Amino acid sequence: MTVRFLFEALNMAIDEEMARNDKVALLGEDIGHYGGSYKVTQNLYAKYGEHRVIDTPIAENSFVGAAIGAAMTGLVTVVEGMNMGFILLAFSQISNNMGMLSATSGGHYHIPIVLRGPGGVGKQLGAEHSQRLECYFQSVPGLQIVACSTPYNAKGLLKSAIRSKNPIFFLEHVLLYNLKAEVPDNDYVLPLEKAEIVRQGNDITILTYSRMRYNVIQAVKVLVEKGYDPEIIDLISLKPFDIETIGKSIQKTHKVLIVEESMMTGGISNVLQSLILENFFDDLDNRPMCLSSPNVPTPYSGPLEEVSIVQTADIIESVEQILTNKM
């Protein structure tokens, strides 16, 4: 075990998979000589060369399309979006080709492609660089969505994503790259469709993912001091959801709070709330509560940015409302 930053764990995952499979190739802006904006691809250009680590023009629609075409011919392509907000420029390729080609070709083609990069609300990156695209991509048929949250699961999940035959949107939060934790030095993979029980509890199920995992953990420390016993589940797989793990927790606690950084309208919490009501209605003491960001562009101002997303105090207040029947 070695203590590593999350960006280093991602770098290790890519390096190991490129060494394991010579069909793995990287595409993206400044991923070669520069090593990527957040150094996830550092040293890979020198090790594997320009034919496998490809610096692209600033043309997201074109290089995502090229990566899809390469995947159709047998390569495994890992595409970095310098910022996930820019990937919106490739939405046609992602929706019409990356997600659906396997089905529309009758299974003739597999599209082994991982679309990864920084997203989420950062420190004063402005509205255009604070996009949360998991909501947009929820409706794309054939596309899996995975959100890493620790150095350990970042490495194991990315390795699994690269080995998958399916197209995967791999979400990395911009504020988690410098998170440090122990990472095994050996080769390991983690299941892409399995949630993680971060803390076991009996009073309420709190479902969350990515950066909000840490806001929830901080809130639960306060709640435990007040005598509450919440269960925390990191969803990890945002499409499909690990409905088995979620369901077992709900059948134990009978109460649910969903915490996300995304906006509620069209957000992850809306979809998950519907699934919970459809599958576990009789197990609930009250309706699942969704705690999401307001439907506004992310402000550049630091203080305004802070109030534009869910804070620890909001989580504490929501849990107490649910557990005291004051919803």
UniProtKB/Swiss-Prot annotation:
<comment type="function">
    <text>The pyruvate dehydrogenase complex catalyzes the overall conversion of pyruvate to acetyl-CoA and CO(2). It contains multiple copies of three enzymatic components: pyruvate dehydrogenase (E1), dihydrolipoamide acetyltransferase (E2) and lipoamide dehydrogenase (E3).</text>
</comment>
<keyword id="KW-0670">Pyruvate</keyword>
<keyword id="KW-0630">Potassium</keyword>
<feature type="binding site">
    <location>
        <position position="60"/>
    </location>
    <ligand>
        <name>thiamine diphosphate</name>
    </ligand>
</feature>
<dbReference type="InterPro" id="IPR005475">
    <property type="entry name" value="Transketolase-like_Pyr-bd"/>
</dbReference>
<keyword id="KW-0560">Oxidoreductase</keyword>
<keyword id="KW-0479">Metal-binding</keyword>
<comment type="subunit">
    <text>Heterodimer of an alpha and a beta chain.</text>
</comment>
<dbReference type="InterPro" id="IPR029061">
    <property type="entry name" value="THDP-binding"/>
</dbReference>
<feature type="binding site">
    <location>
        <position position="161"/>
    </location>
    <ligand>
        <name>K(+)</name>
    </ligand>
</feature>
<dbReference type="GO" id="GO:0004739">
    <property type="term" value="F:pyruvate dehydrogenase (acetyl-transferring) activity"/>
</dbReference>
<feature type="binding site">
    <location>
        <position position="162"/>
    </location>
    <ligand>
        <name>K(+)</name>
    </ligand>
</feature>
<feature type="binding site">
    <location>
        <position position="113"/>
    </location>
    <ligand>
        <name>K(+)</name>
    </ligand>
</feature>
<protein>
    <recommendedName>
        <fullName>Pyruvate dehydrogenase E1 component subunit beta</fullName>
        <ecNumber>1.2.4.1</ecNumber>
    </recommendedName>
</protein>
<keyword id="KW-0150">Chloroplast</keyword>
<keyword id="KW-0786">Thiamine pyrophosphate</keyword>
<keyword id="KW-0934">Plastid</keyword>
<dbReference type="GO" id="GO:0046872">
    <property type="term" value="F:metal ion binding"/>
</dbReference>
<dbReference type="GO" id="GO:0009507">
    <property type="term" value="C:chloroplast"/>
</dbReference>
<dbReference type="Pfam" id="PF02780">
    <property type="entry name" value="Transketolase_C"/>
</dbReference>
<feature type="binding site">
    <location>
        <position position="166"/>
    </location>
    <ligand>
        <name>K(+)</name>
    </ligand>
</feature>
<dbReference type="InterPro" id="IPR009014">
    <property type="entry name" value="Transketo_C/PFOR_II"/>
</dbReference>
<dbReference type="InterPro" id="IPR033248">
    <property type="entry name" value="Transketolase_C"/>
</dbReference>
<dbReference type="Pfam" id="PF02779">
    <property type="entry name" value="Transket_pyr"/>
</dbReference>
